[in-house]
Amino acid sequence: MKRSLEQIARLVSGRVVGDAAKKVSGAAPFEQAGPEEITLAGSAGFLKRIDQTGAGALVVPTDFTDSRRNLVAVENPAAAFARIRQMFDTGCRQPVGIDPRAVIGGGFACGEDVSIGPGVVIGDHVTLGDRVLLYPGVFLGNHVRIGNDGIIHANTSILRECVLGNRVIIHAGSVIGSDGFGFAPDGEMYVKIPHSGMVQIDDDVEIGAGNAIDRATFGRTWIRQGVKTDNLVHIAHNVTVGENTIIVAQVGIAGSTTVGRHVILAGQAGISGHLDIGDNAVVGPQAGIVKSIKPGETVSGTPGMPHKLWLRAQSIVAGLPGMRKKIAELEKRLAVLEKG
């Protein structure tokens, strides 16, 4: 479906420079865009080469004034272009309706325009909102609730009593609501601790492929609004992750830790249990965090330390062999002096 630049500008709160009635049918990369496509020229490097793209229109910063081309000027070109791409991206959506090869339990309720693919298994008393999309092989346990516009990709399991908000996306192979890793020592044995809580995932959360988010021992494991996780992330029982936090691949968060808002946890970081990670904190890649982090602090290394201190420590590492040799020589000279 074609859209006019005027329609696009309204979508992204932008301003049209040029022909507002110009219609485009999609979005494309700068070098490949054609006359019926819109592209992104959000940085100085692309703006200098604006005559080299065949695009019918460009998304640009508000301070760009070249009027030779059709432009949509916005405050944040990258975010605006992402929204434009969402508008044109229909994906490979399966047809609306319930595939006859799906298995659905009693007390099922759903909204309008739901799509349930082959091999989906739905337990008892499950509720789906409008336009929910369940790809093949999805499993929903008893009493699961999913809000409007949810997309659950293939072979994902959402276990009993878990609750998902609106516009939640969960990628293939993730498990939501598995038992937490909880065992009580009893001599040489371990007694399993029942996990009777649930997982709550709020609006506009996107969970990567192969994630495992454990249900709470009591209460809830809580993934709050706008959180984005990369692939292969583990979030343990009773963890709370604050709004709009980013969790990169292979991060592990141990039980009962609270992660604040707008936090960045870089790849392969490990967070110990029962900690508080403050709002706007940044944890570097492969960091091992064993104590709480203050709001706004940037921490790196294992054990985690302030990032600047970690950089200083790392700068010393390469010189340690030479320092060891010098110390050995000094020890020999000192021994000679002591024998005097």
From Swiss-Prot:
UniProt keyword Transferase, yes or no: yes
User: Which keywords describe this protein according to UniProt?
Assistant: Acyltransferase, Lipid A biosynthesis, Lipid biosynthesis, Lipid metabolism, Repeat, Transferase
A Pfam family annotated for this UniProt entry? Hexapep
Output the GO biological process annotations, alphabetical, semicolon-separated. lipid A biosynthetic process
Catalytic-site annotation from UniProt: 237
- What's the domain of life for this entry? Bacteria
The cellular component terms of Gene Ontology attached to this UniProt record, alphabetical and capped at eight, are:
membrane
Q: In which pathway does it act?
A: Bacterial outer membrane biogenesis; LPS lipid A biosynthesis
Its EC number is 2.3.1.191
- Which CDD domains does the record match to this protein? LbH_LpxD (cd03352)
Which transformation does this protein catalyse, written as a reaction? a UDP-3-O-[(3R)-3-hydroxyacyl]-alpha-D-glucosamine + a (3R)-hydroxyacyl-[ACP] = a UDP-2-N,3-O-bis[(3R)-3-hydroxyacyl]-alpha-D-glucosamine + holo-[ACP] + H(+)
Q: What does this protein do?
A: Catalyzes the N-acylation of UDP-3-O-acylglucosamine using 3-hydroxyacyl-ACP as the acyl donor. Is involved in the biosynthesis of lipid A, a phosphorylated glycolipid that anchors the lipopolysaccharide to the outer membrane of the cell.
Say which family it is in: Belongs to the transferase hexapeptide repeat family. LpxD subfamily.
Q: How does it assemble?
A: Homotrimer.
Q: What is this protein called?
A: UDP-3-O-acylglucosamine N-acyltransferase
- Naturally occurring in which organism (per UniProt): Desulfosudis oleivorans (strain DSM 6200 / JCM 39069 / Hxd3)
